[in-house]
């Protein structure tokens, strides 16, 4: 959904990109709420809820604002930041096999 958001934004489909970003949020939030505490890479239990909150109030909020303003540069920057937080969370969980494509 991350790349779909970018693709829609790049083709000027701003309302659709905003809707896709909301689907992305829904998927992430659902995944975390279904199992908020998981084993981390080092064997320690990791509570993902604070990571979700940071994701929501940081790059996701910035993405929403950029899409609403139809600002391509700001949208790309927000998507890159959003992706980086996803990668960080996956790394904390030892899920380095889950690959997230680069944002172009």
What are these regions (language model features)?
Residues 1-104:
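Sequence context surrounding c-type heme c attachment/ligation sites in exported
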């Amino acid at each position: 959904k991350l790349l779909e958001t970018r693709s829609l934004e790049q083709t000027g489909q701003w309302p659709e990109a905003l809707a896709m970003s909301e689907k992305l949020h829904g998927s992430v939030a659902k995944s975390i709420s279904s199992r908020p505490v998981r084993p981390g890479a080092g064997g320690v239990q990791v509570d993902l809820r604070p990571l979700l909150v940071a994701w929501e109030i940081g790059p996701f909020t910035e993405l929403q604002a950029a899409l609403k303003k139809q600002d391509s540069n700001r949208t790309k920057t927000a998507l890159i930041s959003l992706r980086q937080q996803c990668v960080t969370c996956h790394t904390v969980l030892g899920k380095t096999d889950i690959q997230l494509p680069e944002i172009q």
